[in-house]
Amino acid sequence: MTTQLDSLRNMTVVVADTGDIDAIKKYQPQDATTNPSLILSASALPQYAPLIDEAVAYAKAQSADKAQQLIDAEDKLAVNIGLEILKIVPGRISTEVDARLSYDTQATVEKARKLIALYNAAGISNDRILIKIASTWQGIRAAEILEKEGINCNLTLLFSEAQARACAEAGVYLISPFVGRILDWYKANSDKKEYAPAEDPGVISVTKIYNYYKEYGYNTVVMGASFRNVGEITELAGCDRLTIAPALLKELQENSTALVRKLEYKGEVKAKPQPLTEAEFYWQHNSDAMAVEKLAEGIRKFAIDQEKLETMLSAKL
């Protein structure tokens, strides 16, 4: 029996959106993505206790300063979890930069270099890592610098066409346009509460971005993210990559209904437009209330979970 997950794998690279190693073993994705919220929830699992202890011991050996120890411990824990995941997935792990650095280009670059150095010290080459950065103007500029250094980036919390365009123009390796959070916003801010998959505003957004990239010949990978239901996933079958939570991977694995490819650009490739200026980026991005609100909210939520992680680690330092 061919499952929908099998069919999806034939047209899209399937990525697991989790830090749960047992789930990754079960669904055998090509890559895995983590974020501060997923690191926080993974840290509560008993099998991660040794990774936390090792990160704390590492931090204590690096510095006597408590504030520095905390920074080192959280960076090392994120990498430790990534290292465990890389024992299972054949492809890449996405590890996220502290969301509180989202508006600081230089600090983002420095944090990314540090995370890469920790992976390199553990014997992992750059081609197995993606550094996740929020798709702010400052984050996109940081990614532009990092890509030139051979550090590939995954630009996340992407909600607007302006963000997508700026990422492609910066030569970013991969973007993660969010689907479910866009749907959440439209449900909360309009009278319409139910959407068929084909009319889901998150699905429409990713479809537009995918077609724009193919139309202008951008090499940046489009990886749809943040799904609320299987319908959103099947409606994006054919997207370069899709990062999917274990509960939805399970649904796809248990369903054998035929899957039809939905995304496939067959038109001509056009000459690329002039890159957006900073002023144009902000005007276009800020013209989309949903994108403005969801980007800011996403950064706040990741920062809150980063702080919860710090509270947990502080008790051990």
Curated annotation (Swiss-Prot):
Domain of life: Bacteria
Gene Ontology molecular function, alphabetical: transaldolase activity
UniProt record, GO biological process: carbohydrate metabolic process; pentose-phosphate shunt, non-oxidative branch
Function, in words: Transaldolase is important for the balance of metabolites in the pentose-phosphate pathway.
Pfam families: TAL_FSA
Ranges that cross the membrane: none
Family membership: Belongs to the transaldolase family. Type 1 subfamily.
Pathway per the UniProt entry: Carbohydrate degradation; pentose phosphate pathway; D-glyceraldehyde 3-phosphate and beta-D-fructose 6-phosphate from D-ribose 5-phosphate and D-xylulose 5-phosphate (non-oxidative stage): step 2/3
Protein name per its UniProtKB record: Transaldolase
Key words of the record: Cytoplasm, Pentose shunt, Schiff base, Transferase
Subcellular localization: Cytoplasm
Gene for this chain: tal
Active-site residue list: K132 (schiff-base intermediate with substrate)
Presence of the UniProt keyword Oxidoreductase in the record: no
